[in-house]
Amino acid sequence: MENRSALYLPMTCKSALHAVSGIFPFKKDLNVYRGCENGCKYCFAVYSHKYMKPEEKQDRLSNGYYDHIYVKTNVAERLDKELSRPGFKREAVNIGGVCDSYQSAEAEYELMPDILRVMIKHKMPILICTKSDLILRDFDLIDELSKCAFVNIASTITITDESLREKIEPGAVSAKRRFSMLEKFKKTDASIGVHTMPVLPLLTDNQENMEAIFSGTRAVGADYIILQTLHLRGQTRQIYFDFIKNEFPALYEKMRYLYRAGHLDKEYKKRFYSMAEPLLDKYELSTDYMRPVRDAFGNDRETKQTVLFDFG
């Protein structure tokens, strides 16, 4: 089935939850879809489609990640079975680690309401980050879950200029709509956050954009904001450089230079954070991503305060 330029491919999954490691407030990840229609040019997750059927791949670099969307039609059923196992450890689940759970396909397949009902049944703590306000459709379910378990609702907001956002995140909604969505969830018992990640060198790292994001974050009463500069690895690196060359050719050579060592130039990164830190103070914003988790679970978890939350 086609939606815009995307092909939807229903499938059944053998498991719903997958273990993750690292400095995160969750130990398990759940992806309702494989692939993402948001089409973000900086997406780190395009690699994940290389494991899908090769005859259904299109683009050489993205492997069809943006336009071949696998729909896990039985995911809620599998999730319920996994959470019902004796001795299952009740730890926070991140919903949508390598896709947006509320991308356009969700408007048609409506898998998330059943996922949320399963989470309510088992009183499971969850985290959701989305670039869509379709999540408001499920407001009542999320509100109910937030009253019996830890819930964190976040949105990636890194571009406030709409003309630029439409080029870089063509399938997402505007920053204004994302802020509005977060403000509505502030009425629940969920914690809310803004993920300004990635910050794009030469495009979104200017003071005007940062001020707009930070002031918006303050206005909606977000519990935290986290920043991370752009990492370019694997297929993402070539996809992003090709995008810059086509859309912003005047920036191409400088962008290549900034990533000449395989990562963002350290001095450039230092200058950015030197600009951003005073603005965080100005708007009295917390960058402690883990604080809501500590508040919910106590200090016996492996949590620590982060400074600007850049993974380096």
Q: Which sequence ranges carry the predicted segments?
A:
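Auxiliary Fe-S-binding modules of radical SAM enzymes
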Residues: 1-12, 18-19, 207-312
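Conserved strand-turn element in the central/C-terminal portion of the radical SAM core barrel
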Residues: 160-162, 169-171, 184-206, 230-232
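Generic structural signal for hydrophobic
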Residues: 119, 182-185, 217
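Surface-exposed amphipathic alpha-helices with a cationic face
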Residues: 143-146, 182-187, 277, 281
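Active-site glycine- and acidic-residue-rich loops that bind
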Residues: 133-136, 200-211
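Conserved Radical SAM active-site core
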Residues: 1-154, 158-166, 175-180
